[in-house]
Amino acid sequence: TDIENAEVYILGFYIDMTSAKLHEVLDMLKKGRQERSAEILRRLKALGMDIPLEYVLSLGKEGFTGRNQIFRAMVNLGFARPDKRYGDFQRYLGKKGLAYVEHRGLSPEDAVRFVRDSGGVPVLAHPGTDIPFSFIEDLIGIGLEGIEAYHPTHSKETTKKWLKFTKSRGLIVTGGSDFHNVSPEEPLGLGSLPVPDSIVLELTQRWLKISSVQSTPSC
């Protein structure tokens, strides 16, 4: 979801995939994404780019769609250049873009609570340089357990900053090479980003710790 100057993504590791609440929330998010995509497409059409919603939906998985699928459609139909990911994408679909529509999903706070309630480990994804420490401190107070310090968009300096921050706050570190980028010049995906093996062990240990606390009956 969005905050004043940045977009916030919460990852959920070890979520119970059979949870009825999970599927209820996913259905809500899917509907919200489709409504947002339809509004973005209306704005793009006003700019001379007529892109059918059905085509965009066909580029997503199981009905989920968003700006990355819209941008892929723009590229496929000749409305954007694939080598201008942060030019054309930001111009039309970025937070200050001509066709941008604010995302109305779970708030970061609700997302953290939801992941924990679903038996998972909530982690802040690729915070970059735009998310203020004070905001993250608030999420920690709610139950945030980690930060994705290793990410293709993070410079070495940014990664070091978040490694230091997580250590000082007792958080776990995670990493990901990402899978939803559509730019051919950015090699994202499995195996494209070195991440220490120890991260998996620490993540699993944190999940087991959370699970044991949640399963302990109160006196």
Task: Locate each region found by the language model.
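A metal-dependent hydrolase metal-coordination microenvironment
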Residues: 1-66, 142, 146-184, 192
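Active-site gating loops and adjacent loop-to-helix segments of metal-dependent hydrolytic enzymes
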Residues: 1-34, 72, 76-97, 189-211
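Active-site-proximal loop/helix segment associated with metal-binding centers of metalloenzymes
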Residues: 35-54, 59-106
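Conserved, well-ordered alpha-helix/loop/beta-strand core segments that scaffold catalytic motifs
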Residues: 99-142
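Active-site-proximal helix-loop elements at catalytic-domain edges
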Residues: 133-148, 206-217
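Short, function-defining helix-loop hinge/capping sites that tune catalysis or transport
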Residues: 134, 184-186
